């Protein structure tokens, strides 16, 4: 499978790459340079670049969005919400049926996430609260 990974140099990137690299063709993208030990295809790309994400996803079978930004309101919105829009737009434009978007599990259940003890299910109502990261990821999920 040909996979586009958005935001791939962050915390989850190395684990996802390790799990996929031997069986799939990966294009890693991020605004930061890849780790020195990464020997695959890399493109410098911001997840909120709608045209850039659409172009990078051409010919791909799957898009995985690992992007995250927490420290600035506008940038968090651009990355988590507009970035998700860019990903979904690219999937629709290029007829990509497999899309994975990562985000905090507590955007589903708010600050009471400890009470669920990891038992997340589709019937859980979203409760992102007012925390910047959870709220911006929740808005992205709504797209």
Annotated model-derived regions:
Residues 3-23:
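N-terminal Rossmann NAD(P)H-binding glycine-rich loop of SDR-like oxidoreductase domains
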Residues 6, 29, 63-67, 99-105, ...:
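SDR active-site strand-loop-helix element
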Residues 24-35:
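Conserved glycine-rich Rossmann-like NAD(P)H-binding loop of the short-chain dehydrogenase/reductase
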Residues 34-35, 45-82:
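NAD(P)H-binding glycine-rich loop region in Rossmannoid oxidoreductase-like domains
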Residues 40, 61, 97:
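Conserved acidic residues
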Residues 77-84, 88, 100, 136-137:
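Short alpha-helix in the Rossmann-fold core of NAD(P)-dependent oxidoreductases
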Residues 86-130:
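Conserved Rossmann-fold NAD(P)-dependent oxidoreductase catalytic core, especially the SDR/UDP-sugar
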Residues 128-143:
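Active-site Tyr-X1-5-Lys
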């Amino acid at each position: 499978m040909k996979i586009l990974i958005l935001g791939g140099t962050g915390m989850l990137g190395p684990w996802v790459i390790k799990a996929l690299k031997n069986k799939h063709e990966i294009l890693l993208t991020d605004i930061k340079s890849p780790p020195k030990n990464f020997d695959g295809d890399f493109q410098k790309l911001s997840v909120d670049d709608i045209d850039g994400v659409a172009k990078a996803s051409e010919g791909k079978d799957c898009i995985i969005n690992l992007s995250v930004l927490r420290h600035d309101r506008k940038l968090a919105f651009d990355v988590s919400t507009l970035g998700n829009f860019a990903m979904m737009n690219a999937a629709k434009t290029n007829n990509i049926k497999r899309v994975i978007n990562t985000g905090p599990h507590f955007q589903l259940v708010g600050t009471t996430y400890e009470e669920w003890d990891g038992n997340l299910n589709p019937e859980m109502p979203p409760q992102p609260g007012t925390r910047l990261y959870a709220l911006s990821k929740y808005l992205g999920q709504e797209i």
